[in-house]
Amino acid sequence: MKTVSHVLALVLLVPCAAPAHAQIMEMNGSWELNAAKSLGPSPVQETLVFEITPGLQRYTMTSVDAEGGRGLNEWEIRYDGKDHPTRTPGATASVRRLGEKTEFVVNMREGRITSTYTRVLVDDDRTLISIGRDGEGEVLWVRVFEKQ
């Protein structure tokens, strides 16, 4: 948990230093949720898949909750910090880089922020920490994913 606490503190203090258009290529691949290392509510299973090419991020999230319900979220958007439509009607997402190993995602529906994620690569790019916030900026959860 020390790593999660240190990363959370760092993410909240680091200024935006990297260009918004420079993707974090080390995020490419599949990531599995480690629920035991995560904080706050989380599904029993969650997989993130990133396919990043210059200027574009393809993202797929699949999950299973405690009741067996399945979740799916996916997009293919330019990595430029601007709002782009997702596959959910009325929803947009934007992705921008905050630092060498940190990106910031804003999800909106009908022009209102619904959630944000700060994603940080740690442990030699083998661990991805995702900090989820609601539309008002309150931290909902900190999820730890391991590279597959």
Describe each region flagged by the PLM.
Residues 1-5:
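Positively charged n-region of N-terminal signal peptides that target proteins for export
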